Amino acid sequence: MAPYIMIVEFLCLWSSVSAVNCPFFVFYDAITSLLGFSIIWKPKEKVTIMAEAADFVKNKINNGTYSVANKHKGKSVIWSILCDILKEDETVLDGWLFCRQCQKVLKFLHKNTSNLSRHKCCLTLRRPTELKIVSENDKKVAIEKCTQWVVQDCRPFSAVTGAGFKNLVKFFLQIGAIYGEQVDVDDLLPDPTTLSRKAKSDAEEKRSLISSEIKKAVDSGRASATVDMWTDQYVQRNFLGITFHYEKEFKLCDMILGLKSMNFQKSTAENILMKIKGLFSEFNVENIDNVKFVTDRGANIKKALEGNTRLNCSSHLLSNVLEKSFNEANELKKIVKSCKKIVKYCKKSNLQHTLETTLKSACPTRWNSNYKMMKSILDNWRSVDKILGEADIHVDFNKSSLKVVVDILGDFERIFKKLQTSSSPSICFVLPSISKILELCEPNILDLSAAALLKERILENIRKIWMANLSIWHKAAFFLYPPAAHLQEEDILEIKVFCISQIQVPISYTLSLESTETPRTPETPETPETPETPETPETPETPETPETPESLESPNLFPKKNKTISSENEFFFPKPVTESNSNFNESPLDEIERYIRQRVPLSQNFEVIEWWKNNANLYPQLSKLALKLLSIPASSAELKECFP
């Protein structure tokens, strides 16, 4: 009898070699025929076997091991809903696709789309059945004309892929179909000045359309914004950018408000505030007192916004933690320096093409780029090691030490992504992120020296830098994530007081305090335009020195759990409530007490905005506060994507 392995073992084995882009069927044939293994499963049809493999890939997507690409490069209409699946190293998983409509994993081999076209979601797509097929000769002429255009007019080659360019070509085809070839091109094309005026008028028209919406969000206290600055190193010119965030009809909305040059002025607090107010005034917003700002800890920005509610950018704080941790440990500092040396040598020597994947460069303003750089070297270690040997280049680390650092920082990358998202609430994940990092950095007797040193420095710096700069806004946002409402027992009184101060209509509320220290219950504000934080300043003046030893302890939000993660929610909430409790023994007088007593289970696909939408009638005032807080981004990192 031939050797055998179980189906689960087989799938795990295939997953381990999928990093080299080995399709499922190729690996299956190799195992069964070349190695003489038999796969033990119940006699099933091939469709059932493939379904098990598809479920295996789908689980990897659900737990965050795999991700879904934005778009597949293809001309067929099916690629509007089908996309590639990316592995941990961001390379494409060969042999599988993901359907955005039904959320299913589909097999895809040898670029054959016939089976994909029969997928139920693809059958519903409108197909351009009346389009004519262009001959190969005409395609060659099109290539020639496009090449001449990009060369003569100095356009990027990617210009032909733009949606605007394609719309322009379609328009010209329609003109040709109506008038034929006898058309004066110069008469059809507009003058550059006409284009400029048209673009300006369109911009003014769209600006007027969104100005009323922006002003309404600001006046109602539902608006927040991120502010960041960037320097053009070539001309030594500073720029300031602002993104605008708000909630509308239970949906999070965000937009780039604008980028402004400092016009070679010094980036003083006065000049920064003037630019910020100038950008808002372009949208008819003259008073920005109600806007909550998320920024880094730059002294000039802090001074400029001292009259506003300002929260620290969580991604920036986490970056500071990691940067300081590496700089304080010579062994870790040498690893980063050596990795930068390797990337620089490979690029200057034109050796990138000899590697399986491209080496990533580190960006000084984006600390998680260091992780991507180290991981890209680890993924290409065999080739990199060979290159270093041939060039007689010595580095201050080995593969083992690099791997342990990359493994630790892998979960940090996941946290970075969660904090930097703007399409879904992120501020409620700030406290869970800290708790998760404290768990990940717990000392282990089996840790190598590099791992132990990194964990030690992170634990110390996260308490000094990040935990010391938390505000009541972060605690309240976490409190308003229903499955976690009961997890901040020590801070619950402070959170209650803050929530009541932020609710803009009177509610019946009675505080029964058993503590010897009784804080003053703030009165309901008469004007809804002044959201203040009465209890806790958002940014301590001396964040490097914690107040008491107790402030250095973990928030203890979650119990310890093994590192087997089955979903993104479980990554941040290891032990959530699993049973609902909406029946109470007594009837509290206010929404907050009623909300605290309720136990909301955390499902795998729990959506916090959707929950508040469904419970808006039960919590009419608290739901408005929740949406206002949850629309605040945790990070200003998204704005950096606007900068070159």
Swiss-Prot record:
It is found in: Nucleus. One of its GO terms (molecular function) is zinc ion binding. Its main location: nucleus. GO terms for biological process: DNA integration; DNA recombination. The keyword Nucleotidyltransferase does not apply. The keyword Nucleus applies. Sequence repeats lie at residues 521-523, 524-526, 527-529, 530-532, 533-535, 536-538, 539-541, 542-544, 545-547, 548-550. Essential for hobo transposase activity. This is Transposable element Hobo transposase. It comes from Drosophila melanogaster (Fruit fly).
